[in-house]
From Swiss-Prot:
Keyword Phosphoprotein included in the entry's annotation: yes
UniProt-listed InterPro entries: Vesiculo_matrix, VSV_matrix_sf
GO biological process entries: viral budding via host ESCRT complex
One Pfam entry name: Vesiculo_matrix
Subunit structure, as described in the record: Homomultimer. Interacts with viral nucleocapsid. Interacts with host NEDD4.
Gene name tied to this protein: M
Modified how: Phosphorylated by host.
Identification of the protein by name: Matrix protein
Length: 223
């Protein structure tokens, strides 16, 4: 650098700021616009009830998630809630239990679970508008992967109005199935990125439209 100063006749005086040539660039040449360190926290209270009645018993968790993935085909509500609804449904499905005594003569089975609580969700969807408490019901037939039956889903989420109580909901899901967490998340139609600190953050690869200003023993232990 001193050679450049001599070449261009630049004198460095005490107390003056360094010339541009003497400073190191602080911004990378190629900036990572998908920085998992930049995220928001959605604090919310949630409630979800899930009942699945099928003509044949479920074999794997992947089979179940495949039946639930398209729950929102006819969804007309807030688009911002969509991913959060999908996440609480996922949380409920991870601990879905067979209802004792509901195997019928024809081999059909009923599975059920209810989960509720307060939590926070790290996400990269930007600022979310207020979530108002309302119960939304989704009921649809399933005919896929060799299963026939009916899914009943009742969900609600709402803001905590400034309170910050509850655990990381993504972490709860990860603890329930640590070996298959990311695989199951993708199978239900969600994405998550792991930050440098090991925290899972609800993420997206392709942006979706948004509204203007969204350990109990498992049924499938071996899956």
């Amino acid at each position: 650098m001193s050679t450049l100063r001599k070449l261009f006749g630049i004198k460095k005086s005490k107390g003056t700021p360094p010339t541009y040539e003497e400073t190191l660039a602080t911004a990378p040449v190629l900036m990572d616009t998908h920085d998992t360190h930049s995220h928001s926290l959605q604090w919310m209270r949630y409630h979800v009830e899930l009942d699945v009645k099928l003509d044949t018993p479920l074999k794997t968790m992947s089979d179940l998630l495949g039946l639930l993935k398209n729950w929102d085909v006819d969804y007309k509500g807030s688009r911002n809630k969509r991913r959060f609804y999908r996440l609480i449904m996922f949380r409920c499905a991870l601990e879905l239990k067979h209802v004792s005594g509901t195997y019928s003569v024809d081999g059909s089975a009923l599975y059920s679970n209810k989960v509720q609580g307060s939590c926070y969700v790290p996400h990269r969807f930007g600022q979310m508008p207020p979530f108002k408490r309302e119960i939304e019901v989704f009921r649809y037939p399933v005919h896929q992967h060799g299963y026939n039956g009916m899914v009943d889903l009742r969900m609600s989420i709402c803001d905590l109005n400034g309170e910050k109580i509850g655990l990381n909901l993504l972490k709860e899901c990860q603890v329930a199935h640590p070996n298959h967490f990311q695989k199951y998340l993708e199978e239900v139609g969600l994405e998550a990125a792991c930050s440098a600190t090991g925290e899972w953050i609800l993420d997206w690869t392709f942006p979706m439209p948004v509204d203007v200003v969204p350990r109990v023993p498992s049924l499938f232990m071996g899956d």
